[in-house]
Curated annotation (Swiss-Prot):
The active site is at 91 (proton donor). (2S)-2-hydroxy-3-oxobutyl phosphate binds at residues 88-89, 128. Belongs to the DMRL synthase family. The gene is ribH. This is 6,7-dimethyl-8-ribityllumazine synthase.
Length: 155
């Protein structure tokens, strides 16, 4: 029989880090609220969630790298939340490209989840932060719980 491994969505005893971009805060605060809702619903204690605010999505990868190297903080998973909305310049491409590097700085010790929404308009961002298209912060947090359990199972 083929062995199958799958992480469960049970967060009891897990410690999570959420790194949140302050830029487009009206969107990222909704994403953070969604993440906190997911943690609560899946058994992660509020005291086991550490939120780190960074200026923008561009700063997410370097902050992930710093958290992973920290001796002070140890987490079951890290979630990165941000909102990059296309404007009239090429800045969108630069920032969204840099934000997407969060996975490349991960060292494999804990899951690093990309919860940054990249949209063409403010309306799309609002939809993905909890109105029509669900809440991507909630989805990122449940993915983090599941992946933390999977990493633990893999050993």
């Amino acid at each position: 029989m083929t062995a199958q491994l799958e992480g469960l969505r049970i967060g009891n005893g897990q410690k999570h880090c959420v790194i949140v971009s302050k830029f487009n805060e009206f969107i990222t605060e909704s994403l953070l609220k969604g993440a906190k809702d997911a943690y609560r619903q899946h058994g992660v204690a509020e005291s086991d969630v550490t939120v780190i605010y960074v200026p923008g999505a561009f700063e997410l990868p370097q902050t992930v790298k710093r958290v992973l190297g920290s001796k002070k903080y140890q987490f079951s998973a890290i979630v990165c939340l941000g909102a990059v909305i296309r404007g009239a310049t090429s800045h969108y491409d630069l920032v969204s490209g840099e934000a997407a590097k969060v996975g490349s700085v991960a060292d494999g010790s804990v899951p690093v989840i990309f919860g940054v929404i990249t949209t063409e308009s403010i309306e799309q961002a609002i939809e993905r932060a909890g109105t029509k298209a669900g809440n991507k912060g909630y989805e990122a947090a449940t993915t983090a719980i599941e992946m933390a359990n999977l990493f633990k199972e893999i050993g």
